Structure formats: structure tokens, C-alpha cells
UniProtKB/Swiss-Prot annotation:
Changing residue 47 to A: No effect on activity. One of its GO terms (biological process) is methylation. GO terms for molecular function: caffeoyl-CoA O-methyltransferase activity; metal ion binding; S-adenosylmethionine-dependent methyltransferase activity. It catalyses: (E)-caffeoyl-CoA + S-adenosyl-L-methionine = (E)-feruloyl-CoA + S-adenosyl-L-homocysteine + H(+). This is Caffeoyl-CoA O-methyltransferase 1. The gene is CCOAOMT1. Transmembrane segments: none annotated. Monomer. Signal peptide: none annotated. Mostly expressed in the bottom and middle parts of the stems. Methylates caffeoyl-CoA to feruloyl-CoA and 5-hydroxyferuloyl-CoA to sinapoyl-CoA. Plays a role in the synthesis of feruloylated polysaccharides. Involved in the reinforcement of the plant cell wall. Also involved in the responding to wounding or pathogen challenge by the increased formation of cell wall-bound ferulic acid polymers.
Length: 239
């Protein structure tokens, strides 16, 4: 679990104080049950210079369980990277399940695509390259996607999380879930003002804090914030 490189502050994929305890969780409950395609993609992604952007293995396991528990069928993912969380979702969905996946970088997505294809899951995925906001705006304008998504996972540009939420709340069904990743930003949300954070970490931290405050005040949703991975907040639409 490397912590060197540009993403040191936000790349550490556990908020536990003990690395040994996190390793115990991985080795006892996560890695032994990790499907072979996910293991293969995790190992491929580990060689990527930006590997710390990937979804952690324990969070992938959590997403898989969650999707099965809510019987999700129509899903969306904003922010794909090499596709580890996308693969977890595709494996958890029924054969006729669908994922609308959006990312500004097709090259990263294509790193994981051969693994997805080999697993026989590519038919579940519609990938769109480019910014997600124009796509969401068009979907809302079309009118036929209102309340049509069972589950939406967002792991993208933190400075647009609130902009995503304003749109996704219309696209997720009542009773459906939106999951926002990195909502604890490697613990920096409680860092003192004089903490030695890198410029981009401090910049995005303010947007994460703003999001957390807005979600807590949004009466249209029930929320649950969990210290899984880098923090994930689940929002269940109730109105």
C-alpha cells in the first residue's frame, strides 16, 4: 500500500489508525473473496503511475454487496479510472443490468477494458468519454430518465460534486442510492488550519466540506457516511 508520489495525502486507502488492522481486514475478508477478474485488474492498476486514484479492494467489496442488497439493475458511475469499481458493479448486477459510465479519460478506462471483456461483462457498460455534467443536463432535458436509476456512484472531480448532486437527485429513483466517494478526504476534513497539506489537497478539501454540509442539510435524502476506503457517503432519496 504505497503512499509515496503525488497523491500521498489522499491516496492512503484506509482511515484506520493501524495499517496492520487494515491489512488484517484485506487478508482475512477481502482478498480471499475477491473475484479473479477484480484481482487481475487491481494488480494491473497497481502499475499505473496514478494507481492511488483507484477504488480500494474493501470498498469494491462493499459496493458489490450494496448493489446486491438493493437489487440494483440500472446504474451510473461518474469517474471510472481503470474500472475497478465499474467491474465490481458489473459483476454484482444481473445479466440484463446496465451501467452508464462516464470519465474524461478513455485511455485509463481501456486499461481495464480487456479484463471486463474477458469476464463477459462489457455488454452491461455504456462508456461515455468527456465531462459528465453536459450528459446529465441532456438527460434531464430529455425528461425520460427522471427517477430511473437504482444506484449512482460518484468518484470524480470533487469541485463538481455539488453540481452532480443537483442533477443526480432527479435521476435516481425514490428509494435509490447515490454514493459519493472520498468524503473524508483521507482525514483532511478535520485537519487544523495550519496543517501542512499540499495545495490541491487543501483546495479540494473545501469542496468536500461544502458537500458534506449540503448533504447533511438535504431533506430529500437520508444519509450514511462511512469510513470505508477514503470515506463514502450514501444518500437514499426519499422525496
Amino acid at each position: 500500500m504505497a503512499t509515496n508520489g503525488r497523491h500521498q495525502e489522499v491516496g492512503h486507502k484506509s482511515l484506520l489508525q493501524s495499517d496492520a488492522l487494515y491489512q488484517y481486514i484485506l487478508e482475512t475478508s477481502v482478498y480471499p473473496r475477491e473475484p479473479e477478474p477484480m484481482k487481475e485488474l487491481r494488480e494491473i492498476t497497481a502499475k499505473h503511475p496514478w494507481n492511488l486514484m483507484t477504488t480500494s479492494a474493501d470498498e469494491g467489496q462493499f459496493l458489490s454487496m450494496l448493489i446486491k442488497l438493493i437489487n440494483a439493475k440500472n446504474t451510473m458511475e461518474i469517474g471510472v479510472f481503470t474500472g475497478y469499481s465499474l467491474l465490481a458493479t458489473a459483476m454484482a448486477l444481473p445479466d440484463d443490468g446496465k451501467i452508464l459510465a462516464m470519465d474524461i479519460n478513455r485511455e485509463n478506462y481501456e486499461i481495464g477494458l480487456p479484463v471486463i471483456e474477458k469476464a463477459g461483462l462489457a455488454h452491461k457498460i455504456e462508456f461515455k468519454e468527456g465531462p459528465a455534467l453536459p450528459v446529465l443536463d441532456q438527460m434531464i432535458e430529455d425528461g425520460k430518465y427522471h427517477g430511473s436509476y437504482d444506484f449512482i456512484f460518484v468518484d470524480a472531480d470533487k469541485d463538481n460534486y455539488l453540481n452532480y448532486h443537483k442533477r443526480l437527485i432527479d435521476l435516481v429513483k425514490i428509494g435509490g442510492l447515490i454514493g459519493y466517494d472520498n468524503t473524508l478526504w483521507n482525514g483532511s476534513v478535520v485537519a487544523p488550519p495550519d496543517a501542512p497539506l499540499r495545495k490541491y489537497v487543501r483546495y479540494y478539501r473545501d469542496f468536500v466540506l461544502e458537500l458534506n454540509k449540503a448533504l447533511a442539510a438535504d431533506s430529500r435524502i437520508e444519509i450514511c457516511q462511512l469510513p470505508v476506503g477514503d470515506g463514502i457517503t450514501l444518500c437514499r432519496r426519499i422525496s
